[in-house]
Amino acid sequence: MKLGIFVNTNRHLGHVVGIVKAALAKGHEVIMFNMDDGTKLLGTPEFGELCKTKGVTMSFCDHSAKGLNVTTEGLPKEIVCGSQYNNAIMNHDADRVIIL
């Protein structure tokens, strides 16, 4: 199963990390897309490490990040700088989507 996680707030980092780890432990793939305040998590080490985990793909809305002055320089190459197209792909490819 592919689990999509749509992150549009920076208030639930612990939940995001826990859900990702639980899904991976069950053998599921995880697709994440961040926008709005969710892009503020990009700079946190705990969040950034998730993209290096096998079975996890991550992207974020560049427009949201720029609008909130979120620094995207130095992000791991595994985190895709994208747009709402990446959100659409996640929603198409995921079997289930959680919004946090």
Label the model's feature ranges:
Residues 1-2, 100:
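Absolute protein N-terminus
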Residues 3, 29-30, 58:
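Hydrophobic anchor at the start of a short beta-strand
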Residues 3-14, 35-41:
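Short, glycine-rich nucleotide/cofactor-binding loops
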Residues 12-27, 32:
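Histidine-anchored nucleotide/phosphate-binding helix
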Residues 18-19, 45-47:
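A short acidic, amphipathic alpha-helical/loop segment
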Residues 47-71:
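A glycine-rich helix N-cap at a beta->alpha junction
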Residues 70-100:
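C-terminal structural segments of small proteins and small subunits
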